[in-house]
């Protein structure tokens, strides 16, 4: 069950990253989130 949750989160994260990557300032946003 835990593995399924991780897979779901990975899919969601991938979608978010793709959306951010198409917008200006995406790199800045990612850096801020990682800190």
Swiss-Prot record:
Molecular function (Gene Ontology), one example: toxin activity
User: Where primarily located?
Assistant: secreted
Keyword terms, alphabetized: Amidation, Secreted, Toxin
- List the GO cellular component terms: extracellular region
Q: What is this protein called?
A: Cupiennin-2c
Q: In which tissues is it expressed?
A: Expressed by the venom gland.
Q: Which domain of life is it from?
A: Eukaryota
Location(s), subcellular: Secreted
Is Secreted set as a keyword in this record? Answer: yes
- Per the record, residues carrying Glutamine amide are 35
Family membership, please give it.
Answer: Belongs to the cationic peptide 04 (cupiennin) family. 02 subfamily.
